[in-house]
Amino acid sequence: MSVKTHLPSAPSDTSSRSRCFWLRLQAKAFLVLGMRSKAHAVFQDILEIHPQDVLALNSLGFNELNDRHLVQALGFFERALVLTPTLANAHFNVGFVCEELGRSQEAEHAFRAAIQIDEKMDRAWYGLGLVLVRQRRFEESLVAFKRNTELQSMSPYAWYQMARVHMEMQAPEKALEVIRHLNGFEPKVAAQLVRETGLNLDRPV
């Protein structure tokens, strides 16, 4: 008489991990194909299986952000931050959405946390500068924007903001210095600032 042997079934947690693995591959394929809504649905399925899946949380957060569903995006990013508190990007994502929502103090806290982890995160310095401007803390904002320009010297964004801040501080000469610097590598942005500020590049310093 033959004896039938039965292999033990895989533990449920192993099955869940395997299913999440294949679902991630499927979601990434949908993203590559530009099928964001289908990828969104797959990431939701992943969270039902594994609520602490950071990739799914961040992906859903970015999807909501792209659709301008800011509160929903913040919810996903905050959940991801709880799971990855030592990652600068996790703090930055929360700060970015808070800044978009006009929640300046929360955004400032998140950007500063990101910088504390990664002092060279240029976009966190830029975000910090923006929220400090919103709070009319102009001197501090200039420090943040200056650090951004040290990390990204050829990016015009912080230079642009610095010129605007100098104008807010009634310092047109300093604004003009920034505009002249910008004119050397981003003449279109410099021209925009000339129109906005009414300053003349030919004006003597």
Where do the protein language model's features map onto the residues?
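TPR/TPR-like alpha-solenoid repeats
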Residues: A29, N63, V97, V131, ...
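Alpha-helical segment of the N-proximal tetratricopeptide repeat
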Residues: S15-L55, S59-H69
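Structural marker of alpha-solenoid helical repeat scaffolds
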Residues: S15, I49, L83, I117, ...
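TPR/TPR-like alpha-solenoid helical repeat scaffolds
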Residues: Y160-Q170, V189-V205
